[in-house]
Amino acid sequence: MNINFARQGFAWRSLAMPAVLVLTMLSSHVLAACPTDAAIDAYVADFAAKRISKGFGNDISAVDAECAKKKLSIKLRKVLGQPVGYKAGFTNVALQQRFNVDGPRWGYMYDRDMIDILAVVPAEFGARPLYEADFIVVAKDAGLADAKTPLEALGHIEFLVPFIELPDLMLEGTFSGNAMVATNVAFRGGVLGMEIPVVKSQAFLDALANMTVVMTDENSGKELGRAKGSALMDNPINAAMWLAQDLKKNGIALKRGDLLSLGGYVPPQPTKTGMRVQVKYIGLPGDPAVSVEFN
C-alpha cells in the first residue's frame, strides 16, 4: 500500500506537537498494521490442521484485512492447490448487516477441494464446517469487467454453474466481517453442478433474477432455506459484474475459465454426519440442482 503524506502548509512548528498527540498517533499506527508473516504462517498451520484459530484479531481494519488476504492467498496454495477463481462475499444485504460490512468483498478460490456434481465429503471437512447455497459463473474473457449492463455481461460469461460452497468459519468466538475477509472469506472448497449454457437475452436475465433457490435436506424432505435470485445484488449477474470490476481495480484480469462464486443465498449452516443436501434453482431451464452428502 502506497501512502502519500501531503506536505502542503507544513510548518516547522508542527515538529513541536504535544506528546499526547504523538503517543496517540504512534498507538494508532501500531494497532493498524498488516499481520506479520509469522501470524500468516500460524493461521495456515491452523487451517491445514483443521483447528479453530484466533485469526488476525476481531478489530482488524478493512485495509489490513485486505493485506492479510493477499499474503494468505500465496501461502494457502500449499494446502488448497492452485487458484481456480474468486469468490464474492457479502453480496447479500442480510449478510452485510449480520457482519457489519458496508458492501461486498472477495477472496480467492483453489482447486483441490472443488468437487463435481454428486459429492460425498466428510462432515468434519474443516474446523467449523458449513454448507451454503451459492452460484457460479464461468468467465469467457476479461471483458466482463468492462460490461456496462447485465445483458452485455452475459456475452462475457461462458456458463452458469449450480454451487454448494463448503466454507470453514474457523475463527474462535464471534467475529467481524473484516476478520472474515482477512481469512480469505472463509473459503475451503465446494461442490459444482452441471454447467448451464448462457443465453444472451433479456428473458434469460429475468429468469436469473426471478428464480427461486431452494435448499433441502434430501433425507427428511425438510426445506432448509430459500431465496429469490434477486437476493444477490438484484440479479446474480450484477454480483458477477461487481466482482470482475473490483478484481480489475486490484490489477487482476479475468481469463477464460475463471470461476466466479457470487455469494450465499441463505445463511451458511453446520454440517451433520449422514445429511444429504440439495440446492435447486427453480425457474432456470430444467430446474438444475446440485447435491452433497456428508459422511
PLM feature spans:
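Catalytic-core "active-site belt" of small-molecule-metabolizing enzymes
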Residues: A33-D234, P288-S291, N295
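Short, exposed beta-strand-loop hairpins at the edges of beta-sheets
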Residues: N184, Q278-G283
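Short, charged beta-turn/beta-strand-edge "cap" motif at the junction between a beta-strand
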Residues: V266-Q269, G283-G286
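N-terminal secretory signal peptides that target proteins for export/translocation
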Residues: M1-W12
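Hydrophobic helical h-region of N-terminal Sec-dependent signal peptides
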Residues: M17-M25
